[in-house]
Amino acid sequence: MSKLYLMSLGCNKNLVDSEIMLGRLSAYELCDEPSKADVLIVNTCGFIDSAKKESINAILDLHEQRKKDSLLVVTGCLMQRYREELMKELPEVDLFTGVGDYERIDEMILKKTNLFSNSTYLQSENSKRIITGSNSHAFIKIAEGCNQKCSFCAIPSFKGRLKSRQINSIIAELKDLVARGYKDFSFIAQDTSSYLFDKGEKDGLIRLIDEVEKIKGIRAARILYLYPTSASEALIKRIIASEIFVNYFDMPLQHISDNMLKIMKRGTNSTRLKEMLNLMKSAPNSFLRTGFIVGHPGESEADFEKLCEFVKDFGFDRVSVFAYSKEEDTAAFDMEQVPFKVINKRLKIIEKIVDEVIEKSFEKEVEQKRLVVCTGESSEGEFFIAAKDLRWDREIDGEILINESECGNLEMGQIYECEILQNLDKKLLAKALRKVDAN
């Protein structure tokens, strides 16, 4: 049997596309060593400069490790965005494709030909997919593309405009995954709260929540990448009212200064953002994640200080911060740029604030009782079982270490009620109290 090595870079949306490719290539034996693979695939990220460099380095590194007569295939956002340049500059690569042909990857390899469709690939209920990384959790991509016009983001230039999956397609995939033992789902898109806007439906995500709740066997779900202008008060209240969707609110804000929100073309203001955030925060057991960009063109010292004060005071649970990356095909590209030294200085300042904010979030979990799902052996060694809070997204929000159990041996993928005993440098030590369900 021929062997396949696949490297998926970038976001969880890319991961879903990689899993689609694995589904099409199920005849191959997956391997962990590039040097033994007959086919090597890199699913690239082309979002910001650091991601582009990571993708190029990964391609060159795999070329160095590959065996003679193997095929090196490069796909994904970087290829879609820089197709002509990369095909000229990467003679190491055998086959190229972009973001439109994931379900034709088997055909492409068989015929040894490049493929570049004009449209972005959109998953259907007939798409074969092999879930990786978990036996209980899966990401569900509900749309592709984006209609927003943020000044710093090039994604619409290579992913295109919003294209939503049909609800029946999503429900069919969920039912199949539940039948295979999956019970925990994260719904993703570039802008999830705009789901079905392209079909003229303004409450599409609410309708999807209604349909998801009818499926027996789903234990938890969360929605990632809410966009401030497309996420309505009604949507937030519907999530809060749900018995399946946890009160996990992931909304990248990018800034809080009204001046910067206008420059960044975010379509909203700080007053509306704070009202929405306070509504989210009022939910029982709420968990708030966001992200900010520092050093965007036009950011004054006063704007930056306003951002720092807000991050320090609001009480987010998780915050990601990024240095502005100058990207072609964006409105900010031709604006007067903030000097690199200033950007780096600001990044270090806000990273310190964020570190303290996240530490407080972990600390407030001590003595709480939480539902967790066991995920495997801990990174801290054989004496701990790793778990995640059922509210959390997979991998990015933290790790719970269980070293005591009042309910016998713990099963992977099973849900338990745990008491949080201690915060160990952003890892929570816990004791399992009881098994929550028998599924």
From Swiss-Prot:
The opening ranks of the lineage are: Bacteria, Pseudomonadati, Campylobacterota, Epsilonproteobacteria, Campylobacterales
Q: Which residues form the MTTase N-terminal domain?
A: 2-114
Q: Kindly provide the name given to this protein in its UniProt entry.
A: Ribosomal protein uS12 methylthiotransferase RimO
**Known EC number:** 2.8.4.4
Entries under Gene3D superfamilies matching the protein: Methylthiotransferase, N-terminal domain, tm_1862 like domain
Q: Where is the Radical SAM core domain?
A: 132-363
* Amino acids binding [4Fe-4S] cluster 2: C146, C150, C153
One Gene Ontology molecular-function label: 4 iron, 4 sulfur cluster binding
Q: What HAMAP family is this protein classified in?
A: MTTase_RimO
Q: Where does [4Fe-4S] cluster 1 bind?
A: C11, C45, C77
Taxonomic source organism: Campylobacter jejuni subsp. doylei (strain ATCC BAA-1458 / RM4099 / 269.97)
